[in-house]
Amino acid sequence: MRNTDTPIAVEGYPFIAGFAAATLLLALLGQFLHLGFFVPATLFFVLTVFTVFFFRNPERVTPGDENTVVAPADGEVIFLGKVIEPHTNGEFEKISIFMSVFNVHVNRAPISGKVVDGFYTKGKFFDVRDERASFENEQQGLVLETAAGLRMVVVQVAGLIARRIVCYAKTGDSLSRGRRYGLIRFGSRLDIYLPLGTRIDLVMGQKTVAGETVLGILP
């Protein structure tokens, strides 16, 4: 897997460079040609600052207990319950986290384990707060297995605005809990399917911090 420890996620560099270049160009044109470029230059400057903010990639302090499942994403819990996960066709405890454009969008491994399977599904782009998004939207998933043999599934879901999923991990990789493994651009959702018997330690509407907030304790 790639190095993901930069303070700004590398996927944001092209956007930041483009907006910054446009800001500089418009400012120079306005300065030397005395043209009315102040407003568009200001607009692109604001876009540059927002893009830096959006692709921020802060360090996190992950709890030490290996049986603890941590949040894979910053955001708000919008679903809790038992479901059948469509890729494995198994029953799991499902937690869905909605990431707004104001949240950090870097995703982190919820547990330490090996990636035993990965899948990508083309799909639609429903609003990710709509439960249909879990099953019908474009998505990238990983099946993780712990050292104790427990399996769980973590799925990055694209949304109405977010249509670019980035996943660094692949089948055969080993992930440590809290490690960065991907991101989704510009607002999205992340679904995590935990083994039955996991003690869930959060409630609907709760805010989560990737790599730090405890979702539950494995059985």
UniProtKB/Swiss-Prot annotation:
It is an enzyme of class 4 (lyase). Its EC number is 4.1.1.65. It is found in: Cell membrane. The active site is at S188. It comes from the Bacteria. The keyword NAD does not apply. Keywords: Cell membrane, Decarboxylase, Lipid biosynthesis, Lipid metabolism, Lyase, Membrane, Phospholipid biosynthesis, Phospholipid metabolism, Pyruvate, Zymogen. It catalyses: a 1,2-diacyl-sn-glycero-3-phospho-L-serine + H(+) = a 1,2-diacyl-sn-glycero-3-phosphoethanolamine + CO2. It comes from Geobacter sp. (strain M21). This is Phosphatidylserine decarboxylase proenzyme. GO terms for molecular function: phosphatidylserine decarboxylase activity. It is a peripheral membrane protein. InterPro entries: PS_Dcarbxylase, PSD-A. The modification Pyruvic acid (Ser) is found at S188. Pathway: Phospholipid metabolism; phosphatidylethanolamine biosynthesis; phosphatidylethanolamine from CDP-diacylglycerol: step 2/2. One of its GO terms (biological process) is phosphatidylethanolamine biosynthetic process. Belongs to the phosphatidylserine decarboxylase family. PSD-A subfamily. The record marks G187, S188 as: Cleavage (non-hydrolytic).
